[in-house]
Amino acid sequence: MGLVFRTATQAAALLLSLLGWVLSCLTNYLPHWKNLNLELNEMENWTMGLWKSCVIQEEVGRQCKDFDSFLALPAELQVSRVLMSLCNGLGLLGLLASGCGLDCLRLGETQEGLKKRLLTLGGTLLWTSGVMVLVPVSWVAHKTVREFWDETMPEIVPRWEFGEALFLGWFAGFCLVLGGCVLHCAACWSPAPAASSHYAVAGPRDHQQHLELKQANPEI
């Protein structure tokens, strides 16, 4: 029963981590980290991501343009690009390592130690990638809040607001951290040995030894 529960826990944690990894990839490439609504022209909305910015107009539709230079970006977007790209790579490695370390995958009796190490490595990589999602998303959100409430800027100047990708990134980071921690704990958890079979074999053996001792010493 313990082995079945551990296998189900590993599978659920791996699926949760897979969901978090897919969402982190979407967070990386979606141009919706920041939204800008122009009060003077409500028919025009701007969005910004890590790789490009877009303008949405009712007559023309969506038009996007990639950023010309990496060095011209703000510091938070530069660091976010690097961390999000590393997150996607580490998350993929973590999924592959964890998948090879699942109990439901048979690698032979002599490979149990290898499976445990793979599961531990995969869980560590996954929760590390989750942290690498939460850091840039939270940094960009903090910078957006500071700029939004900046009293030195004139009120007529439009301000950036939270985009949908930030909320998607927070959820992705939570899934990766939780899934990675569960996989790491499942690798360290060993099911209790079956005690019933031990006593089932030891019982008749003790009874036989008692009969032999009684025959050798009738006074017992």
UniProtKB/Swiss-Prot annotation:
GO terms for cellular component: bicellular tight junction; plasma membrane. This is Claudin-22. Plays a major role in tight junction-specific obliteration of the intercellular space, through calcium-independent cell-adhesion activity. It comes from Mus musculus. It comes from the Eukaryota. It is a multi-pass membrane protein. It is found in: Cell junction, Tight junction; Cell membrane. The gene is Cldn22. It holds the Pfam family PMP22_Claudin. PROSITE patterns: CLAUDIN. Residues 32-81, 142-164 are extracellular. Disulfide bonds: none annotated. One of its GO terms (biological process) is calcium-independent cell-cell adhesion via plasma membrane cell-adhesion molecules. Belongs to the claudin family. InterPro entries: Claudin, Claudin_CS, PMP22/EMP/MP20/Claudin. Keywords: Cell junction, Cell membrane, Membrane, Tight junction, Transmembrane, Transmembrane helix. Residues 1-10, 103-120, 186-220 are cytoplasmic. The keyword Membrane applies. GO terms for molecular function: identical protein binding; structural molecule activity. The chain crosses the membrane at residues 11-31, 82-102, 121-141, 165-185. Signal peptide: none annotated.
